[in-house]
Amino acid sequence: VYKRQVIGGNGAGKSTMLNAVAGVWPVDMGKILIDGQDVTRLSEHQRAKYIGRVFQDPMMGTAATMQIDENLALAARRGLPRTLKIGITKKEHDTYYELLKTLDLGLEERMTSKVGLLSGGQRQAVTLLMATLKKPKLLLLDEHTAALDPKTAAKVLTLSEKIVEENHLTTLMITHNMKDAIKYGNRLIMMYEGHII
């Protein structure tokens, strides 16, 4: 498991690098390889089968007006052919219940609650589950605890570490916190003015 921490000041290019890896921004030179596969020319939605992502803003990555279980179902069905079938099967419900239980936030008892009613930390935890549900080749964590209070941020970081370790996920995590970079990463990437130094 490679856990690389990307650090650098504001405007150093950290989020731009993640956006290039995710396919949001095209690159004008070089290649982007994920697990040996050249994804440089693939669009963002084509890369989605390789990448899980959690954003800095807890409001991104989930559909606020949908229920927790519906959000998880969207993530589980990502990359599959679209059908007219709607709803969540009993098997899916049971799977999501067990997944949510591992978070230890009581969300398994609130599966039909709208995601928009959750706290920032609860929402980031659900987003983390959604991003890792399909066992991506690469998990991108873009300052995913920056908008949370210190206690909640610590809990989300612990959950992140647990999920990454259990699923053997290669991860790129952007952080401004050097202590977190050292604690959770096994390699550090320092950026300055758009370059890795």
Regions found by a protein language model. Name each.
Residues 154-167:
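Helical segment within the ABC ATPase nucleotide-binding domain
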Residues 7-9:
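The feature captures the beta-strand-to-loop junction immediately N-terminal to the Walker
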Residues 131-132:
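ABC ATPase C-loop
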Residues 175-176:
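H-loop/switch region of ABC-family ATPase nucleotide-binding domains
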Residues 30-37:
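Conserved ABC transporter NBD signature motif
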Residues 38-52, 60, 82-85, 89:
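ABC ATPase NBD coupling module
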Residues 139-142:
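Catalytic Walker B motif of ABC-type/P-loop ATPase nucleotide-binding domains
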Residues 22:
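Helix-to-loop junction immediately C-terminal to a conserved catalytic motif
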